[in-house]
Amino acid sequence: MTTGLPEDVTGGPPAAETPARPAAPRPALEVTGLDVHYGRGRGRRRALAGVSLSVAPGETVGVIGETGSGKSTLARTVLGLVRPSAGSVRVGGEDVTRYGNRRWRALRRRGVVQYVFQDPLRSLDPDLTIEDSLIEPLLIQGRGRAEATARARSLLDRVRLRDDLLARMPSELSGGQRQRVAVARALMSGPELIVLDEPVSALDSANRVQILEILKELGAAGTALVLISHDLGSVAGTADRIAVLHHGALVETGAARDVVNRPAHPYTRLLVGSAPTLRTASADRARREALRALPHT
């Protein structure tokens, strides 16, 4: 009798279907073939040359290079402040390469990407209290003040600051406290990506270690981070991957441990050899554990 069903030629039960692999999460940041030029005519120079880089959700990537290497240009291009000559930039899945100022402002208001300056006072309005500086991004989104203030208190705790600092002005805080407030402000809107420009270069050793530990925790919680720095040693213990820029070209990228212990490019070897903070990496780890036990400041 013909059933119309396919025969099992093996005589056994039908083979189970192979489950489809889950799709890889889209990158929080994807830079492809990026070229940037400054100037015109004979004065035209190339600041970035074919740079490609991706950052996964929850990944921390350190972009390292000396002054003039192109790292700040890369950050400014990712943030829509510089228009590339060629290539593309995708932030949070959106191709933002040709976004104008209006669309970029809308993207920032939605909180997809945030930026933390080297000088935290550039992130904080000197005429606003810490509370007003923190809640401003959520108020712009139309959220209520009570909700915004509750989140501000929660984030101050996350960056190990007391919530009684909400009533203070930025000028009343130490440099390390201001930098932690700037990080908290960047987190207010729940961004997928935060770009930080030299986040610890102006801090003393204790504050440097504490900020880097906070950043490491943010990455573990799912926020993608790009750390811009001239000092390989300052981010080697925090970054998952290191990307090395030299004269506008990406000369090496890899797991942070591999780049530090087995640098492939001569320029990277030079950076490793000239990074005094690498020699104190184990001491930094010990200090992180001690600092975690300290009360909030």
PLM regions and their residue ranges:
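Conserved ABC ATPase "signature" region
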Residues: 147-164
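Helix-to-loop junction immediately C-terminal to a conserved catalytic motif
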Residues: 79
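A short, surface-exposed alpha-helical micro-motif characterized by mixed small hydrophobic
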Residues: 235-237
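Conserved ABC ATPase signature
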Residues: 169-173, 177
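ABC ATPase "signature
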Residues: 253-254
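ABC ATPase NBD coupling module
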Residues: 42, 96-113, 132, 140, ...
